[in-house]
Amino acid sequence: MKNIASFANKKVLVLGLAKSGESAARLLDKLGAIVTVNDGKPFEENPAAQSLLEEGIKVVTGGHPLELLDENFELMVKNPGIPYNNAMVIRALEKKIPVITEVELAYLISEAPIIGITGSNGKTTTTTMIAQVLTAGGQNGLLSGNIGFPASQVAQSACGKDTLVMELSSFQLMGIEAFHPQIAVITNLMPTHLDYHGSFEEYAAAKWNIQKNMTADDYLVLNFNQDWAKGMASQTQATVVPFSTTEKVDGAYLDGDVLTFRGEAIIKVAEIGVPGSHNVENALATIAVAKLRGIDNQTIKEVLSAFGGVKHRLQYVGQVNEVAFYNDSKSTNILATQKALSGFDNSKVILIAGGLDRGNEFDELVPDLKGLKKMVILGQSAPRVKRAADQAGVSYLDATDVRDAAHKAFALAEPGDIVLLSPANASWDMYSNFEVRGDEFLVAFEELKG
């Protein structure tokens, strides 16, 4: 690890636990910092806080008392889910206490180079594809970041021969100062998380932070299907490598049905292991990164053709009576569901949609819904989703939860049909996260299998 001495005896407040906060607290303690952890969940309901206390780390739980900041902290490591308008964060900044997130901490100690991936959709799939291609090419890609493996935990054991392949959320990227990936990917951008960021402009600015410290020796991989990316390409010091499914670019692109990099044919669309136009984009981004890292074409093709997807990301679950089930619980916005539907024949699809009501209308989804066999609709946003279904001429049933929806969808299906969970909404009206929602769909599938 690098910069070990710089944390010795430094007073650090870790604000918020979850996986990243717990990992950051342990790392800082290991580095010799004087660590205090503050989490809003009561101590008796907080196994992570209990565990840290047993290890000798000071914990303050059940709220965020402002007087805690009177203890002369020299650094705050903030859980990315805690917004910058939180009173503790505001007070820390007023007191000139540096506020970073756990990924910045990971960068400061990492001996391994970093490839960072962000975007509204496709982050996890692209991150996983890249890590698998690098590893197959002998470069040992280590998954980390917003993909379930805390970056600071992975960075501790990484060496210079490894590569940290880091999925990064807008929440995490707001808290970077020195963070410097050698390659960065922005898969796409669309309005999401506006309840956290306030506006699309602020959200986009957070994503754009990924290239903040990059130089001409670094590479920024951008989706030239989007005008936003084309417009921003001149606003970075990094060397831009584009990818596109709609035009030939100086990077990765679709030439007929062949994914190509600067004239070199890599793989046909039909040979990619996961369906959908969005996965073609994910594969193109992966190809761009792989070629920049010197991976040979055959290795790239073998990994992409064998790629089985990621849990909850258009995951093929299996079949019951020749009815296929796909779990796309990670589709928490309209674009993600549009991409999912693009991979199927609508006349065979029974779509399960709906979830947290963020006030969005679904007019943009109407063309993509046309021709669906049926929909099963649930959640707070059901009235808005139903309006879109009515406009598309698609009939629907109501469901109380995902399990109920899966059973009702299967009852409507015939051999050869597809039951697709792709909600186009966040999960928090019913479930703590999209993983729990997707897991309930998987449980329903097992029930239907008998």
UniProtKB/Swiss-Prot annotation:
Binding residue positions for ATP: G119, S120, N121, G122, K123, T124, T125
Statement: the UniProt record of this protein carries the keyword Transmembrane: no
Organism domain of life: Bacteria
Record-listed E.C. numbers: 6.3.2.9
Cellular compartments annotated: Cytoplasm
KW Cell cycle (keyword) present: yes
Enzyme class: ligase
Any one annotated GO CC term: cytoplasm
Reactions catalysed, as given in the entry: UDP-N-acetyl-alpha-D-muramoyl-L-alanine + D-glutamate + ATP = UDP-N-acetyl-alpha-D-muramoyl-L-alanyl-D-glutamate + ADP + phosphate + H(+)
Protein keywords: ATP-binding, Cell cycle, Cell division, Cell shape, Cell wall biogenesis/degradation, Cytoplasm, Ligase, Nucleotide-binding, Peptidoglycan synthesis
Matches recorded under PANTHER family: UDP-N-ACETYLMURAMOYLALANINE--D-GLUTAMATE LIGASE
Similarity comment: Belongs to the MurCDEF family.
NCBIfam families, alphabetized: murD (TIGR01087)
Name recorded for this polypeptide: UDP-N-acetylmuramoylalanine--D-glutamate ligase
Organism: Streptococcus gordonii (strain Challis / ATCC 35105 / BCRC 15272 / CH1 / DL1 / V288)
Source species taxonomy: Bacteria, Bacillati, Bacillota, Bacilli, Lactobacillales
